[in-house]
Amino acid sequence: MNMEITNLKSYKELVTLSAEEKTKDLKDYLNDKNRSESLIKKFKNFYMDLSRQRYSEKTLNKLVEYAEEVELKKKVEKTFMGEKVNMTENRSVLHTALRIPIEKINTHKIIIDNKNVLEDVHGVLKKIEKYSDDIRNGVIKTCKNTKFKNVICIGIGGSYLGTEFVYEAMKYYYYNMELNKNEKDQVNNFNNNYDQDNVFNVRFLANVDPNDVNRAIQNLDQYDTLVIIISKTFTTAETMLNARSIKKWLSLKIKDDENLSKHMVAVSTNLKLTDEFGISRDNVFEFWDWVGGRFSVTSSVGILPLSIAFGYKNMRNFLNGCHDMDEHFLHADLKENIPVLLALTSFYNSHFFDYKNVAILPYFQNLLKFSAHIQQLSMESNGKSVDRNNQPIHYNTCQVYFGEPGTNGQHSFYQLIHQGQVIPVELIGFKHSHFPIKFDKEVVSNHDELMTNFFAQADALAIGKTYEQVKEENEKNKMSPELLTHKVFNGNRPSTLLLFDELNFYTCGLLLSLYESRIVAEGFLLNINSFDQWGVELGKVLAKEVRNYFNDTRNQKKSDNTYNFNESTKNFIKLLLVQIKKKKKINTNLK
């Protein structure tokens, strides 16, 4: 379907409707009981509240019409069926297939190259289940015939961000599952004597900066450590340099190649290179070219290390949560479809209000890595400048995503959100804490105190405070009248509230799939390919020339290479190398 989205009938009508919406105040909308109730959407025990967005029911219905006009439903269905919606790389996009339970292997068939891909998916999952159970139960041992205690995951971008988010999100929930076998009250919740046999210390190594290597190995013993190297091609420059560095670290104590291989695992499709690296084929876990890196958490990329950390049964619950939200995304009516409504809301805010940022604000400290994952997931997917018709784009595409857990963010960047540029926010809250504590002399529990801020921030952004209110308050505080404008909050700042019962493995899966699905939907609304990332490539290509130059210069090689750096780059490279030149004579070849 060739289309310029801004020429569509519904888009033009949204231009008119949004102009009307700009004259309205959220304070009035929030007093409309019917509207407020109709904009709370429910799925399972999860709620989404859109009542603080700057649209009426009429405008929201027009947004749904727009989704229908761009044939969103049909495009989502094609994606789930395995059609090659990633047209620039001629690939299917089937991260959703990774979550389909084994009992649906025949009812949810996905045929690619005359084969049901679910058979391969569950073959790998079965291998992960056995391997992770054997690691956890001490059946697979270290070269010292002891149980592994530590895991280092080496990857970059989508090969680690999502997995790290899930690990940090669920780590203390898992620990407390062990503790809660013995009932405790909220006062005595500080007894954290975890069973160390069931706790694996997982670290992530991504940055090629050697400081990240140092951080990853700090206070670890090689004999206790399993290394998982994640690279589909086993050629990713940063990942493989880090892998070689960690292999060298392991070999400082583990001299024998056979013993060394017991401490290394790969998630890759390149068996030739994993063989050459010294990794046993039994320790190589597959994934497929229809799994994009940023959508790979539920492949062996994430499920392998997370199953070692938490047990495969818990990760199956996580996959079930993902699958249930996938099914909701695929089948629910657009007017009740939570990922679609989130996508339409972002599309509306970006295109018709020109809001270019989104703040992700989880009121749950264990989601401290969630915003970083969503930042990559959204901005690498939808940060594009060419549409699906291969034409340059002249409208807003992806917004800039950032965030920090509440209440930390309130003492950081919320000042700008309240009184600077308008930034729509998405607040994520939970009814229950992983670590509930309440003391008799406190008015509320610690978690309730957190959630008071969750609700207060949403209303403060929407309602604000007028000059008249500030003036009335000032009768008591005696602030100089000319300074009162500094305390005015304009309000009318949109927010979305997401509320879950608790963050468990299942709801963590719901949350992940919700955002994955929302970003896929938004890409179709924008008429772009959300599944390639050519913007990553140019820097890699240019880095090769700099790498070759560093190699020639530092090793004082005579080279026939011609380095075509611009003058600015030449000057700064000289500054980098000047200290080395002082120590020994080096020919920089830069004239």
From Swiss-Prot:
Species this chain originates from: Plasmodium falciparum
Catalysed reactions, semicolon-separated: alpha-D-glucose 6-phosphate = beta-D-fructose 6-phosphate
Known pathway: Carbohydrate degradation; glycolysis; D-glyceraldehyde 3-phosphate and glycerone phosphate from D-glucose: step 2/4
Entry's EC annotation: 5.3.1.9
Family: Belongs to the GPI family.
Name of the protein described by the UniProt record: Glucose-6-phosphate isomerase
Subunit and partners: Homodimer.
Active site: 380, 411, 540
